[in-house]
Each structure stands twice: as C-alpha cells, then as structure tokens.
Amino acid sequence: MTDVERMVLRPNHEGEMCPVCGDRVSGYHYGLLTCESCKGFFKRTVQNKKQYQCSAEANCHVDRTCRKRCPSCRFQKCLTMGMKMEAVRADRMRGGRNKFGSFYKKDRAHRMQRNAMRVSTVQVPAVLGAQSQAQTFYQPPEHQVSSSTTDQNNQINYFDQTKIKTEYIKTEYDAHLQSPTLSSSTNQQLSVSDFIMRPGYLVDPQDSLAVLLGSTIDDPLLRHTFPAAYQLNEVKQEPFDYSEQFIHHSLHDYPTYTSNTTNYATMMPMTTVSSTQSLVTSTSSTTTGRMTEASSTSPILPLCPAPTEKTVDHFYNSSIAEMCKTLPDDAQIARIFTSVKGTSKPEKHAFSIQVAEENLKDIVIWAKNDQLFSKLSLDDQMILLQTSWTTVHIVDITNAMVHGNLLSQYKMSNGDEVPVGLVALLGNQTFVSSWNDVVIRLRNMGFTNFDYCAFRFLALFDQSMDSFPAVSTARSRVLQSWREVRCTTAFLEIFEQIRRLAYDSLRYLWNLHSNCPTNWEQFFPEASLVLEMIRTTVNRSASSSVTAITQVPAIQLPTPQATYTAVPYMAS
C-alpha cells in the first residue's frame, strides 16, 4: 500500500496536538481528540472516583513534560477542554458509551475527504491501463470555479508533490469537532466506500462539504467512480447510521443542482457560545432564490457547557461513598467488647446479650441521623428498628471478623473464652458454624467497606417493609449506589443468609424468655433494651395478620452456597 493510499484510507491525525497536554493525538476519547496518556488518566480518575487537590493555586501549567505533576489541574483541564465523565464505563469494560457514533463516523469521513482533496495528481497503478494513469483525485478546473470563489492555489500547494505528504490545516469547522459530546474511544479505519460518494450524487448547497471548504466549488471527486484496485477487502468498514437526515434526495425541479457551477454562501466564522446559549442554525438562500430551512441543513451538534464544580460534586455525591461517611469506625465493635468485659457477668449468654445491648444503642443513634429514616413517623421508626436491629448487629460483628478486628475466640473477665459467633447470634449455639462459613466466604470474596455500608442500610430498610414509600425509595437508592462498585449477586445471597440467621437468633431469645424464665432472669436484667424490643415485636405480631414468632417452625440452614428466599418478617 502506498503512502497516498494510507493517507486516504484512514483518518489523519498527524500534526494534531492534544488540547490538554500537547502530546500527539491518537483519536477520539470521551468526547475529545486527545492523546493516549490523557485518555487513560481521565478514565482512571472517573472509574476509581479519585478526588485530587492542588497544592498550589489550582492554575498549574499542564504540558507533555509536566502533566503528571498536578493531577488536579490536569483533570480540571480535561473537563474544561470537553471530556465527558458520563462517557466512561462504570463497569470497567472495554469501549465507551457511544451516543453520537454516527456523527464521529461522518467526521472521520470528512477528514479523509479533505486529505484526498489536497492531492493534486496521483498516478494510478499500471494494471489499470495507460488511459487511467493521468487520473486525478482532485483538480478543480478553472471553468468550474465561480467568481466568488477564493483562491484555491494555497489549498492545493499544501500537498508536497515530492514526498507525497500533507499537513493538517485546522479550519473553523473543527470547532464543532471539539464539542464536548460523547464519543467512542475506538479508532477504527474506514474503507474508501465509506467516504467516497457514489456516482450521480447531487451536491446539496447546505452539505457539510460547503462548511468545510467555505467556497463555491463543484467537486468532481463526489461523482467519480473510484478504481476497483482501491477497494481493499482487508480494511474493516465501520457501520454508518443511514438515518433520514443523512440521505440526500434528488430534486428534479431544480436542474441547476446538476450544473457545472454551484454557488455556495460564504461560511462565516463560528462565534463563541456561552454556557447558557445554544448554537442555532440559521437559514440561508441559494442562487435560485429558494429558501432552505434549518432542518434541511447538515446536522451540527450544539456546544455543551463545561462541567462546573457543582455538577462534578453531584456526580460523586450520588455514589455509595457518601453513605460510608455515616458508618461507625472499624474499632467500634472491639471497643464494645472491651467495655462489656468489665461490667457483665462472666457467662456466655449474659456477655452476648450485653454486647447486643450496647451495640443496639449505637444502631438507634446511627439510624436517627439518616435523612430518610428521620423523615418517618415515630411509630414507623420503631417498627423498622424492631425488624432490623438483629440483622444490623450480626452485620457489624461479621464485618469486624472479616477485617481482623476480632479474633474467633474472645476471653472474658474470668478467663473463659466465648466464640465471637455465639456473641453475634445472641447466644444461639446452633448456627455458629453457619455464621463462620459466612465470614470465610465474605473474606474470600473481598468484602469491602462499600459492601459493609450496603449491608447495613439494606438491613435497616428491610424489604419486608417495602409497603412504606420511604423505605422502598431508600432501598432503591442503596442498591443503585452499590451497583457502582459491585456487579455480582453473590453478596446479596450472603446477605439473605445473614437475615435468616438474625431471624433465628431473635426467635431463640423469645423461646428462651418464654420457656426458661428462670434462666432469663438470671442472665439478663429486667430493664434490658433487647428484652423490650422482643416483647414489643411479639405483641405487635400477635395482634396483626403476620405469623407470630412462636408459630414459625425451626429453620434449618442449607449449605452456604444455596440461594435463600425472602424472609417472612414479623412486621408488615
């Protein structure tokens, strides 16, 4: 393949510089023609939700030699130049979110047309015969240029006849190409058939070619049947969106369209558009006196305003990272164990209930500080806490075990050791092994602080209370934010298992209170907050249509890998 063929068959970005750092442009990335370095930097910043802070005055110079010194100013310059954060895929898969793919395919075709137009005379291969050897790509004859046409010699002389090379000449039209719209990060090559028009194509006075040239030229290249030797099968063709606005229909009522000379109106330079304005395409008239409406002109995308600090903050504030700020610190459960160690009786059941008592107080304070929870009525808040506190309690101790803040055995004041699983399950020895399996699975799956936050909020706004609009809204918000960092349902299956363990532990305490009152009075104080929660829940369940605790049969947990159905909670 000759140098001319390579120039014609692929987009030519040689000579263009990245508007962010000045490096060589590699293609369209997230709405802008940028280099590979700025593309990767922008993608990593958005996907990892990094927040930089400039150590100077937030006006650092960014170029190729110092672009890594201040990532804050570099990211702000990316946004200012027009790169779009919403074009980055959150699932970290290859490829961008291409909403204007047809526009950029047409743009690549225009760029390759301009490269072909700068070629003066190209010798066709000898296999085509001697008659076609003098054939030209683009050579406007003198009689086809009207009197209002600007001198074309400067454009033709840009092409070096000796080295068969050209330089990129930036025009006013390129301001539209740098519009901060979504684009694909891929840079596929086009074949000749993708940008060379078919024979008999009628040039519309408002065609994008007139915008590119800004002159009155009837281009013979558009009506030229390209040699078959240049139809290279190995060049992959990009699909083109042949929508109605890109199809030019023949207008038989106006024979001047097929004349040798067509006069175009002079293309005015594009003015600067503010962030509150939009680009309006004005109407123009042809030499025939017919007015062409704006809807028939070539599609021009509006200039989008650069993202402001408010919009950027809103993008990050909508994630689960904001919810994590309300979580207790990692050492809170360990501090509760230590404080209860010196005050409770040296007995396993008493120690377990006392830990739950102290943690329940913190859970109530945390829930009241949540915006959605605080908007509920006092009765609804009590119902939610009575339904969810055991699940939140188990989630807290499970998170401490996964991250190594607690050992599997905890030594009480008398020297005896109590399994942490027994404390998490409120003294229910039956399902300690199942809880240990949950801890191991979460540790192997990489249970993070984001997952802990989602578990805690999903436990608070339990799905059995979805009849409340506020609860349903809160659950949807948590799941949507959690989906930003997790794309698997395995964690939801484990969460359902924790809910089932919490339900069994709550029923175990009620059975202990009902069947063994002597042991209950020995282990637990009468003014216990945990006992008050259980009594209120049982009284509400007995007076409602929901199955009471004592009527539910024993639950045998299957293997940890099984999927659990919805838990029938006591409250409606």
From Swiss-Prot:
Quaternary arrangement and interactors, per the entry? Interacts with lin-39. Interacts with nob-1.
InterPro entries, alphabetized: NHR-like_dom_sf (IPR035500), NR5-like (IPR016355), Nucl_hrmn_rcpt_lig-bd (IPR000536), Nuclear_hrmn_rcpt (IPR001723), Znf_hrmn_rcpt (IPR001628), Znf_NHR/GATA (IPR013088)
Q: Which PANTHER family match?
A: NUCLEAR HORMONE RECEPTOR FTZ-F1, NUCLEAR RECEPTOR SUBFAMILY 5 GROUP A
Q: Where is the NR LBD domain?
A: 307-567
Q: Where are the zinc fingers (NR C4-type)?
A: 18-38, 54-78
This protein's gene is called: nhr-25
Q: What does this protein do?
A: Orphan nuclear receptor and probable transcription activator, required during development. Plays a role in male tail tip morphogenesis regulating the expression of the transcription factor dmd-3 in a negative feedback loop. Regulates vulval precursor cell (VPC) differentiation, in concert with homeobox protein lin-39. Involved in promoting embryogenesis, in concert with homeobox protein nob-1. May play a role in modulation of lifespan and immunity.
GO molecular function term, any single one: RNA polymerase II cis-regulatory region sequence-specific DNA binding
Write out the annotated subcellular location. Nucleus
Family according to the record: Belongs to the nuclear hormone receptor family.
Protein name per UniProt = Nuclear hormone receptor family member nhr-25
Q: Which Pfam families match?
A: Hormone_recep, zf-C4
- Give GO BP annotations, semicolon-separated: hormone-mediated signaling pathway; molting cycle, collagen and cuticulin-based cuticle; positive regulation of nematode male tail tip morphogenesis; positive regulation of transcription by RNA polymerase II; regulation of transcription by RNA polymerase II; tissue development
Let me know which tissues express this protein, per UniProt.
Expressed in the epidermis, the developing somatic gonad, and a subset of other epithelial cells.
| Entry-linked PROSITE patterns | NR_LBD (PS51843), NUCLEAR_REC_DBD_1 (PS00031), NUCLEAR_REC_DBD_2 (PS51030)
UniProt keywords (A-Z) are: Developmental protein, DNA-binding, Metal-binding, Nucleus, Receptor, Transcription, Transcription regulation, Zinc, Zinc-finger
Q: Which SMART domains match?
A: HOLI (SM00430), ZnF_C4 (SM00399)
Q: From the UniProt annotation, which stretches of this protein bind DNA? A: 15-90
Annotated Gene Ontology cellular components are:
nucleus; RNA polymerase II transcription regulator complex
Q: What induces it?
A: Transcription up-regulated in response to intestinal colonization by probiotic Lactobacillus fermentum strain JDFM216.
- What does the UniProt entry report for the null mutant? RNAi-mediated knockdown results in embryonic or larval lethality in the majority of animals. RNAi-mediated knockdown results in embryos that do not survive due to failed epidermally mediated process of embryo elongation. Of the animals that hatch, larvae display a squat body statue, referred to as a dumpy phenotype, have uncoordinated movements and posterior patterning defects. Larvae also have anterior patterning defects such as kinked or notched noses. Animals that progress to adulthood are sterile and vulvaless.
Q: This protein's superkingdom?
A: Eukaryota
Q: What is its main location?
A: nucleus
